[in-house]
Amino acid sequence: MEQFPNSLSITLLGSAGGAAKAVLAILNQAIVNEKDPIYEAIKNVTFHLVDIKQKDRAYYDELFPNLKEQLFLSEIDLQDVVTFKQHLKESGTSVVIDVSGADTIRVVSYCNELGICYINSALENEAVDQDDSLIGFQLTERYTRFEKEKEKFTNTKAIIGSGMNPGVVQWMVVELMKERPNEKPKACYIVEHDTSFLHDASLIKPHTLYASWAVERFLDEAIWSYPMYMSHHRPLYFYEDVYASEYKVKLGEKEFYGCLMPHEEVLILGKNFNMEVGFLYRINEYTTNIIRQNLDKVEDLWTWNRKVFNPAEEEIAGEDLVGVLLVYENSETYMYNVMNSSQVFHKYKTNATYFQVGCGIYAGLCSLLFDNFKQGAYYVEELLLNTESKYGEYLNLYMKDFVVGENEFSDGLLHDRVRWI
């Protein structure tokens, strides 16, 4: 905390969204818990909540009563450079938490210019999103463009991609690798099985796609991208639909088949480790079936209504399992976390998927505030491997239940796991 003033000022970008709601829910608990490591740091903090379309004051006061005296609301278009920079200066912002859709390179550049710390949950790039010639490869292009700028950020401490995935999953990978320090995995698969869905199926609305997080971002990965994985530090693509095939995942007694999708942590881990890396994801069966039924006309799905599960509006059944599977020659090790939306909502008023993201942001924020490491931009595994960050200790305060195990066999690499639909 030596580098921060006594009266800390934090700006939260994208404050009206689901990820920000989860971050604020955790901080709302932390600020009344003297045993929480962040308690002393935030008890007098000023939170500046920024969004292009801001929520009413009553929304925040009702959800986060322990913070309401410290919340200040602004409505700013982050493309308005002058207004945003003026906000950062006049508010005396020390840390920016970015869970918005604003261009990552631009926002980090401002923080670097002003010496402000930064943390986000995903990479965003407006130019890439608007370039139709990049359809199929947009996620990789966002990563590639950020990589070209990353080493320039030497006047900020920035933690990039500290949500659940990317973010917490990289911590899982590093932790699992410690168990076999003398063995090198053949592959690492980030795995997710999200069964969250409406408890009452009669509430399903026609021509509506359902997901636990931003549906448009899910569609980017699920229907506008090609299946991608990393091998020998290089991204490789299959010229086919993501939902044309799926891959076996076995975590002890749990088994499912997930689709191969591009994801930031695949690129990040595949750069830093020489092994096959992929993300295998299975969303709720309703949305899975809708996509498969429309593979010959996926563009039509963009015209459908989109609904993110909100336990405040309807009861949500199911759970979100996120973890990692390390593949060795004759065995596999795994680690995962499972959260149930109904249980999470009871305490934090958000769904399981967003709460997992919030836990990653909390861990990264604590590391920025308390851990000593040199300036620069870090992905989570770089922070863990190259600094004395206590990221895992902070994470375990709110994400407690990790399952760790071993399969005494190996299902092999991707080509061994595939089944065609």
List PLM regions with ranges:
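C-terminal catalytic/substrate-binding lobe primarily of soluble NAD(P)-dependent oxidoreductases
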Residues: E2-S7, K178-I421
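Adenosine-phosphate binding glycine-rich loop
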Residues: R142-T195, G360, L365
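Rossmann-fold NAD(P)-binding glycine/threonine-rich loop
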Residues: A122-T154
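N-terminal Rossmann NAD(P)H-binding glycine-rich loop of SDR-like oxidoreductase domains
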Residues: S9-A30
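Conserved Rossmann-fold cofactor-binding substructure of NAD(P)-dependent oxidoreductases
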Residues: L78-K89
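Rossmann-fold cofactor-recognition segment
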Residues: N66-D80
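Conserved acidic E/D residue at the C-terminus of a beta-strand in Rossmann-like folds
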Residues: F47-Q54
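Beta-loop-alpha module in the N-terminal Rossmann-like domain of NAD(P)-dependent dehydrogenases
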Residues: V82-T83, V99-Y110
